[in-house]
UniProtKB/Swiss-Prot annotation:
In the N-terminal section; belongs to the dihydrofolate reductase family. In the C-terminal section; belongs to the thymidylate synthase family. It catalyses: (6S)-5,6,7,8-tetrahydrofolate + NADP(+) = 7,8-dihydrofolate + NADPH + H(+); dUMP + (6R)-5,10-methylene-5,6,7,8-tetrahydrofolate = 7,8-dihydrofolate + dTMP. This is Bifunctional dihydrofolate reductase-thymidylate synthase. It comes from Plasmodium berghei (strain Anka). Its EC number is 1.5.1.3, 2.1.1.45.
């Protein structure tokens, strides 16, 4: 037997609170805890703006592209039952149904509970289920024609309307007896259910949901409004898509990879996005017109888009701040990226990166060096601006020789806790060799949860030319594979982060090889993520470039000691990239 809720896309939407005194009777909460929907003919709670906004968004939203699929499905039903030419337009149907809208169905009491200024619910076809209410009652109530309202006497009267009306979805919006009849007759496809997390006096309850038939399939964020928290859940009566079903070529079957997901999962995602802060969305709207190509890419699944999406989010929604350098930034706090090192080497392709410089700097760290001249002799200028006389003097390091960068990354990796004098001193066997220790743990105690390398030495911060940006990494071994997670406190999206992604990925490959493991995953956690003002225009260019497939990285398999690697032991294969983009470093 056909499921009419599926054919005609009939949903329920309701908000339920906890019932006062129920908490005292039972201390074991479950999905039935939230069941109160009315008291003395009105809502048990005072106006909740968040729930009202959600209700309006869900019941007003339409998707013209998805409607093609819905209409095709309904037409097939009509043809199958020889109804296509037999259904006449009901005289009660409003003329405005040529405009695609949703239908909302409610009982008489629910209609009467709506404030007059909101009647009828705008941009929706209002259907009232009542044996006693008459059309003239509605006209007289608001002194207008209320053409957007239809009165039916029974649930069965709804289906002739659904069969001959252009509509997107049909929502049952109350009250209790109406919900119950539709549920009892298996006429509800999904329930959009608001959980108002407070207790109120209630004399009307939502009917019990058959949890063998309906399962919770989506849960929203948690919100606060009118002195209570609330969230939104979706109960779904899931229907697997029949792979043999005839489907028109131009219809959309859903955004999820699993083929058994219904097409309207996309709508559910949109519903849950109802409360995006409009001011935030338009925060930096002066940049919005610059991302035509970026915005034309519908599914941004290439892993490089993790990085590009962060930049886009910061440029469009970031907070404008002054900063230490005087350049100024747009910034946001807290992101994460994951890269599968078993499949590719995440060397960004939307601009050409200086891979030799990345590797030389990493080898310099591994050797525990602090002498910037070593890098300059190799024409690697990453640290040049931080080693000048002016920069060191600004850090009150007047005694420090030019390009003596102090106890920075490599020194902390190899000599943590040792007393630093200058870049010429010999620190062999001084301090804690963290790098040696983590390699030993990976080899001999791989399940240890203390495989941590830390560059943030509070005692030494004032002695460093620049306190570390990427401050801590941890390693994880499972099934012969090594993963690394790195936390970065200060994240220069334009210049620094692309290098950091590549550097710690290479570092993971190197440690994996010397420990006889395979590289698995690099996870990058970003704290203060920022775009410098003088990088914005360059990054707009980068965002409008389409990523290429990532390259692969090959290491000399004969190297078994981390200190024995040289630049010639690294081969990047098939690095396809866009042109270099110049950006000035803010020092």
């Amino acid at each position: 037997m056909e499921d009419l809720s599926e054919t005609f896309d009939i949903y329920a939407i309701c908000a339920c609170c906890k019932v006062l005194n129920d908490d005292e009777k039972v201390r074991c909460f479950n999905n039935k805890t939230f069941k109160g929907i009315g008291n003395a003919g009105v809502l048990p709670w005072k106006c909740n703006l968040i729930d009202m906004k959600y209700f309006s968004s869900v019941t007003s939203y339409i998707n013209e592209n998805n409607y093609i699929r819905l209409k095709w499905k309904r037409d097939k039903y009509m043809e199958k039952h020889n109804l296509k030419n037999n259904v006449e337009l009901n005289t009660n149907i409003i003329s405005s149904t040529n405009n695609l809208q949703n239908i909302v169905v409610m009982g008489k009491k629910s209609w009467e509970s709506i404030p007059k200024k909101f009647k009828p619910l705008q941009n929706r076809i209002n259907i009232i289920l009542s044996r006693t209410l008459k059309k003239e009652d509605i006209v007289n109530e608001n002194n207008n024609e209320n053409n957007n309202v239809i009165i039916i006497k029974s649930v069965d009267d709804l289906f002739p309307i659904l069969k001959c009306t252009k509509y997107y979805k049909c929502f049952i919006i109350g009250g209790s007896s109406v919900y119950k009849e539709f549920l009892d007759r298996n006429l509800i496809k999904k329930i959009y259910f608001t959980r108002i997390n407070n207790s109120y006096n209630c004399d009307v309850l939502f009917p019990e949901i058959n949890e063998n038939l309906f399962k919770i399939t989506s849960i929203s964020d948690v919100y606060y409004s009118n002195n209570t928290t609330l969230d939104f859940i979706i109960y779904s009566k899931t229907k697997e898509i029949n792979p043999n079903e005839e489907v028109p070529n131009n219809t959309f079957l859903g955004v999820c990879d699993e083929q058994n997901k219904a097409f309207d999962d996309e709508d559910d995602y949109t519903y849950f996005s109802f409360n995006k802060n409009k001011e935030n969305i338009k925060k930096n709207s002066e940049h919005a017109h610059n991302f035509k190509i970026y915005n034309s890419i519908k599914y941004k699944n290439h892993p490089e888009y993790q990085y590009l999406n962060i930049i886009y989010d910061i440029i469009m929604h970031g907070n404008k701040q002054d900063d230490r350098t005087g350049v100024g930034v747009l910034s946001k706090f807290g992101y994460m990226m994951k890269f599968n090192l078993n499949e590719y080497f995440p060397l960004l392709t939307t601009k050409k990166l200086f891979i030799r410089g990345i590797i030389e700097e990493l080898l310099w760290f591994i050797r525990g060096e602090t002498n910037g001249n070593t890098l300059l002799e190799k024409n690697v200028r990453i640290w040049e601006a931080n080693g000048t006389r002016e920069f060191l003097d600004n850090r009150k390091l007047f005694h420090r020789e030019v390009n003596d960068l102090g106890p920075i990354y490599g020194f902390q990796w190899r000599h943590f806790g040792a007393e630093y004098t200058d870049m010429h001193d010999n620190y062999k066997d001084k301090g804690v060799d963290q790098l040696k220790n983590i390699i030993n743990l990976i080899k001999n105690d791989p399940t240890c949860r203390r495989i941590i390398l830390c560059a943030w030495n509070v005692k030494n911060l004032d002695q460093m030319a620049l306190p570390p940006c990427h401050i801590l990494c941890q390693f994880y071994v499972f099934d012969g594979k090594l993963s690394c997670i790195m936390y970065q406190r200060s994240c220069d999206l334009g210049l620094g982060v692309p290098f950091n992604i590549a550097s710690y990925s290479i570092f993971t490959y190197m440690i994996a090889q010397v420990c006889n493991l395979q590289a698995a995953e690099f996870i990058h956690v970003l704290g203060n993520a920022h775009v410098y003002n003088n990088h914005i225009e360059s990054l707009k260019i980068q965002l409008n470039r389409t990523p290429y497939p990532f390259p692969t990285l090959k290491l000399n398999p004969d190297i078994k000691n981390i200190e024995d690697f040289t630049i010639s032991d690294f081969t990047v294969q098939n690095y396809v990239h866009h042109d270099k983009i110049n950006m000035d470093m803010a020092a």
